[in-house]
Design a protein with these regions (language model features):
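Helix-adjacent hinge/juxtasegments
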Residues: 69-96
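N-terminal catalytic cores of peptidoglycan-degrading enzymes
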Residues: 1-16
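Terminal interaction module
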Residues: 97-169
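Long, hydrophobic N-terminal alpha-helical segment
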Residues: 12-58
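Short, flexible active-site-proximal loops enriched in glycine and acidic residues
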Residues: 50-53, 91-101
Length: 169
């Protein structure tokens, strides 16, 4: 078994974030993460097991990390992960591969809207520079550990793109 607890991965480890197109229900989340764990238990690169970890945050974000000191993930191993997630998503009626929406927190809930919809929400003042948004493009475990996944829009690229008139250089 190559899967390890997430906290055992080094800060410089490789990270992937897969946003679920909707929040998973309790039982659905359990089945989902068990299926992911089953895949990660056997995940290999060039026949060698990858020391890896996975977790589901907020029943919405699948986080997968790899200890690159142990074995580097190959293009084929990454493709196998993406293909498995695409199939799993299809089986339960969600998308896990689409990073184009903007993910933001509204109270206790996580919302997902198109970029044009988020721009309209920003223009209307419904979302602000203080709105917490999610950066699903993180690639290092360190960034996840320092809280870069969820931060105010003012601290992310979202602030520059959607609040241009409110952000100073």
């Amino acid at each position: 078994m190559a899967r390890i607890p997430f906290e055992e991965l080094p800060d410089h480890g490789r990270l992937w974030i897969f946003p679920c197109s909707r929040t998973l229900s309790g039982r659905e989340a359990e089945v989902f993460i068990e299926t992911v764990y089953s895949f990660l238990d056997d995940w290999k690169a060039h026949g060698l097991p990858l020391r890896c970890a996975g977790e589901l945050r907020d029943s919405q974000f699948l986080i997968v990390g790899v200890d690159v000191d142990s074995e580097l993930p190959s293009g084929c191993s990454i493709d196998s992960l993406v293909n498995r997630l695409r199939t799993l998503g299809s089986d339960i009626g969600i998308s896990l591969i689409d990073h184009t929406p903007v993910w933001y927190r509204e109270g206790a809930d996580i919302q997902s809207v198109s970029r044009s919809q988020f721009r309209a929400l920003a223009k209307a003042g419904t979302v602000t520079l203080a709105t917490k948004v999610f950066d699903t493009s993180l690639t290092r475990i360190h960034d996840l550990r320092t809280g870069d996944l969820e931060r105010p829009a003012s601290d992310m690229w979202h602030g520059r793109v959607f609040f241009q008139d409110q952000v100073t250089a």
